């Protein structure tokens, strides 16, 4: 095992670029106003979506690729762009949102780009930056522009998890260039593009959720998990995580636990969340240690934890008359939504939880079942873990394991998600919706 180092053709400086002083002012309601603007239909049609860790695609054609020297920037800050595979590239900066169903808005284009600076003209949000160079296939580069303003929800993009699985250059924390686990890297650099289409896991594990939240016209702040590692103040009713947020530093976890203690809701629309402890030193991720191996299982603050991989199970609603599954009416089942990875509260440590839903189980099966759990912290914060990493990708029927979902299932997921976000974006849901404990506290 070794550090995943790649010889790169780099343009631009490695150090953050200073920018002239900027003032950005985002008033309440800015997300609604932003999404009233015209979007760009077919904005992503020339970049075929490819799942991360699909390193074989690199044999197909020449591509222009790149990465920023920072995962996120705030007002007045700049991120330097590194171009690989071509001598230069033009970029199109797309902000992801609803935009009357188009999904993104073109903010600006830059010829022969070297950097991006956040200003009043670049609203906070999740961006996909399209690279174009004559004779090369285009790819995306993700970038978050933070707002740090009062908001209904703060969405956290899980870039550390993307990098753990990122096979660009030949090695990830899971396998080496020969595809074998024995040759995997023990550390990986963030100074490299993402494999697949360049967007990491964003287009399937986060984008469908981001677009739905923006459609609801709630005010949203955007961060990455690297921002959480720097222990920021969260000024939102709820923190939202997408479909796959597996890798957490200790500082990240400390921030989340502090926010729950102080009354901020935690909404987890994924599975296998906060499973692995990692260390971030400058722009390098180091090691992978399951938190449960150091007596800090993720269930201590989430109420449930990862237990199964490679499954596909139906979700059976246990509290059909109560929020949030009451939005489904008499329909008490969502087909095939538990998996590929799933969580449970059985056999874990942590606070007492209500089981909102659980997986179906056949008479021949024994042991634990997948669960969606909910509990209220003493602060009044609600912690809801849907416990499956298919939840977000199923919204757009674009899951990476060969799982597909019919139109009814997609609508069910969107209804429940809408109910969760709208309510939890307003208040401490632990006070509003008192959980009915099914599994008591497990010391």
Roles of regions detected by a PLM:
Residues 274-367:
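An acidic, glycine-rich "communication" segment
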Residues 26-63:
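Proline/serine/threonine-rich low-complexity linkers at boundaries of modular beta-sandwich domains
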Residues 213-215, 348-443:
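Extracellular low-complexity, Gly/Ser/Thr-rich intrinsically disordered linkers
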Residues 149-153, 215-221, 235-238, 261-266, ...:
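Loop/turn elements at helix/coil->beta-strand transitions in domains of secreted/extracellular proteins
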Residues 106-109, 115-121, 198-280, 411, ...:
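Helical hinge/lid and interdomain linker segments adjacent to catalytic or ligand-binding clefts
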